[in-house]
Structures are given as structure tokens and as C-alpha cells.
Curated annotation (Swiss-Prot):
Pfam families registered for this protein in UniProt: FBPase, FBPase_C
Cofactor annotation comment: Binds 2 magnesium ions per subunit.
Compartment list: Cytoplasm
Residue sites binding substrate per the record: D106, G107, S108, S109, N196, K262
MF-aspect GO terms: fructose 1,6-bisphosphate 1-phosphatase activity; magnesium ion binding
Binding locations of Mg(2+) 2: D103, D106, E268
InterPro entries tied to this protein: FBPase_C_dom, FBPase_class-1, FBPase_N, FBPtase
CC per GO annotation: cytosol
Chain sites annotated for binding Mg(2+) 1: E84, D103, L105
Subunit structure as annotated in this protein's UniProt entry: Homotetramer.
The organism of origin for this protein: Shewanella putrefaciens (strain CN-32 / ATCC BAA-453)
Protein name: Fructose-1,6-bisphosphatase class 1
Amino acid sequence: MQTLAQHLTSQAVNDSLSQLILTLADTSKAISHAVRHGALAGVLGATEQENVQGETQKKLDIITNDMLKDALKADGTVRGLASEEEDHVVEVSTNGQYLVCFDPLDGSSNIDINSLVGTIFSILPASAGELTETSFLQSGRNQLAAGYVLYGPSTMLALTTGQGVQLFTLHPETNEFLLTNAAMSISADTQEFAINMSNQRFWEAPMQTYIADLLLGKIGPREKSFNMRWIAAMVGDVHRVLSRGGIFTYPTDNKDPKKPYKLRLMYEANPMAFLVEQAGGKASTGYETILDIQPTQIHQRVAVILGSSNEVDACLSYHGLDYSEEPSLD
């Protein structure tokens, strides 16, 4: 089996980008260690702090954020970083070539119940000149690499550099990420969907109708039965989609009119959309392809519908759109 470093060499990924990806992977090993120790290390539970989104921070949110910040500052290739746990972008090195956006611990509400959590990251090119928030506001099509690390029964890294999606598994003895799936592929059709049903009454009418038709199964207009899955961590739900197909959605809702969307574009939706498209799936807000969105702020939120291409098309048809053409990977 190839190690991650060997794989990057075989894919002709340039040295500086390879170095950055390896830094993120090495840091995820340390995060995996902290997650596994849990209560034994006193890292569970919440703090009295809130992040910029007004969410109460877990102890591990802060710990993992600091671990990634420290590693990226020491890497030498990073111009700046943006994190879910940071109010503003952070300047790292004036000589850096890359910008890194990340969610250090996606699904952190799961940590106290020993359920799935993960790290999501996106790598963008840095431009010359002063580093500002605007430097980061690039469409998802500009991503040079993206991935996530899933901390579950085994620790897994899903990665794309624009050459498909590869899956690596952390070997518990050698502490190396080894290539275990060289070409992850999302089936075009599915009978699984993932959505937070507790918000049903707050969704837009197209989404309510779409889900209602799925629930009708064989006796409804879809004429087949569907199963619902929900992990309450985007990283876990998207991993399932990449592994065996499905559709994952966190749609627009009016539960809080000031916050109609849940997921963040720059460090959740964009990297996951890049992975999904590279694996043959599709990703949309319901009205726009996610990777084509021009961001307006670093913590911008969007609706997300992603997964098996035919099922995403079916969902979008309820929104009055036809996305039957294959997405551009340029």
C-alpha cells in the first residue's frame, strides 16, 4: 500500500503543496490521539466561550484549532488561514503560497457521546500583496486541494487534488496514512437520504415536497423506498455518501430568519463539494452550484444539497431547476 507521501509523489503534486497536505495529515494524527483519549485527558465538555457564529465552543474545538494553527504557522508554505473558531483571518507568513480554510472539529457536539467527528480543510492559492479577508473570497473552483479526516473506529483521510478522490486509513501501529481506496466513486442512484427531520416545518415548500415524496416510498411518485440516515456531523454523512452513495442536505429554513442557512461555505460546503464532484456526484444550494458561488464573507453560510448525481437532479427538479448536465471540473 502507498503511503500518503508516496501517493502525492506519484500524482506529481508539487513539493510545497505536498508539504502542506502532509502537515495537515500529521496534525490530524495528533487530533485523532486527543479525540481517542477523551475523558481520560479531560478534553470533553464545553467552555464558556462562543465562536463568531454564536455557538458554544467545546474544549476540543479550541484544542484542535490551536493544534492546526500552530502546525500551519510552522509549515512555511501558508500565507494565511481561516477557521470556524477564529473571528478573523490569521496572517501566517508573508512568503506563503497558500491559504487554508478549515473546520478543526466538525460535529463537535458529538464528542461527549463518543460519536463521529472530523476535520475539514480547503487549500486555496494566495495572491501577492496585503492579506485581507478578501484574499480568501475565491470561488470553490479555485481550490487546489480539499479533504477531511474522519475520527471514527478507524481514522480516515479523504483527499482530492483535482485528480479524483483517494481514501487513506491511518495504520494504528506505523502511524502512517495508507492508501485504501484509490478512486472513490459516488453511485448515480441511491435510496438513502440524510437530513435533520426536526426542522421539517421550517423548510421551503420544494424541500418539504421532495422529502414527503421520499417518505411515501413505493406508493409515492418516486416508486421506490428510501432509508433516512443522520449522523449530525457533516463529515460523517458525506463520508457515507462517498462510500456508498446517497444524498445529504442541510436546506434553507426559516427557523431563525436571521440564519436561514446552517453550513459554512468556505470551510464546509466548498471542500465537500469539491470532493463530491471529483467522485462523480453533484453539489448545489438548490439554486446554484456550490463551487460556482462567489463568496462575500469568510463565515458565509449556504444551503447544501449534495451526493448521487441523479438524486441531486431529482431534488433540484422540485426547485424548478434542471442540472442534468455534468458539472464542469475545470
